[in-house]
């Protein structure tokens, strides 16, 4: 899931850093958004890597959830839980990458003006040559969470326990968890997103990969941009082809394939590339070569070029705080660059065009006046702790009285009471938490 090859790229280039939590550094709790299903199945794979016999799914679900809550408390993280398809898990996703892909496939690209020949054009262009060299296995590799013997996480049981324990959560039945997490991140509600899904990097978020380590590994979007030497919009434009929810083989490309292919094209068309060592290798739009043959404009207009940060060192980029990074590098130039997008011509371009528009609408503030821009945050629900409801719910789902009593004791006695969300936001963000508007001048 996510951006194909992004995790390998991050580890290969030293972009995965250890995050010192607030508890270890002596600070207050750090608000983070938790992509619940991604994290729960990650814990499930660590706790139960093999086949399990004779253990009910409700017991496994509650054990994993208790482990998650304990880890969050020990690392001094304050979670805002986000799950797909709303609180009850029965909503229909209308927005996001999966919904865009499903809609475009159902409507043959989303537009009747496209000729059938163009639907297969993206698979036959030279941008797919690098993938043709890869050896494809004869049998499709099944993910661990999709195996028959893998235990199932009970959706409603998880969310009900989270609600009765007093944790904040988001109930958005028509949205994917990734989009909600990105919204919480860019509205300065949370500082990080707990998820191993790298498409959050494509949406400009900083992600914590693994909570089980004492110093959780973290990938910062600004570090990825600095390593690639590009601004956010150029990053989104080039690597949307790596999104696994939008593309499949052979259209799907890895990050390294995009980098290698674009660097090779640059060397072919720039005569100074092989001789001038001071010029950094940069990435060109995916459709640049195709547009040169057809004589049409690229996704970039002639006046919009790749932003090379020659004067910005890696250290200075790491030292930038979240608000400065978000306001400066993510918002500036996106509205201008959005106007340079040309109408798509192929099915792949339609998918990518709609996803780019969706991402920008999700994370970029809407300009209301010349000085004020507003980005609305999804409503966050939080109720008081109800230990009686927690106990009743556990005993209703677990028939073994001894096991149920043990789990009830763990949740009630070892999980401390959750403080109000507004109190955490005020202590972490300061006066910024009181602002409902953000200026991007």
UniProtKB/Swiss-Prot annotation:
Signal peptide: none annotated. The keyword Transcription does not apply. It comes from the Viruses. Its main location: virion. Coiled coil: none annotated. Keywords: Decay of host mRNAs by virus, Endonuclease, Eukaryotic host gene expression shutoff by virus, Host gene expression shutoff by virus, Host mRNA suppression by virus, Host-virus interaction, Hydrolase, Nuclease, RNA-binding, Virion. GO terms for molecular function: endonuclease activity; RNA binding. It is found in: Virion. GO terms for biological process: symbiont-mediated degradation of host mRNA; symbiont-mediated suppression of host gene expression. Its EC number is 3.1.27.-. It holds the Pfam family XPG_I. GO terms for cellular component: virion component. InterPro entries: PIN-like_dom_sf, XPG-I_dom. Minor structural protein that acts as an endoribonuclease during lytic infection. Degrades host mRNAs in the cytoplasm by cutting them at preferred sites, including some in regions of translation initiation. Belongs to the herpesviridae VHS protein family. This is Virion host shutoff protein. The gene is MDV054.
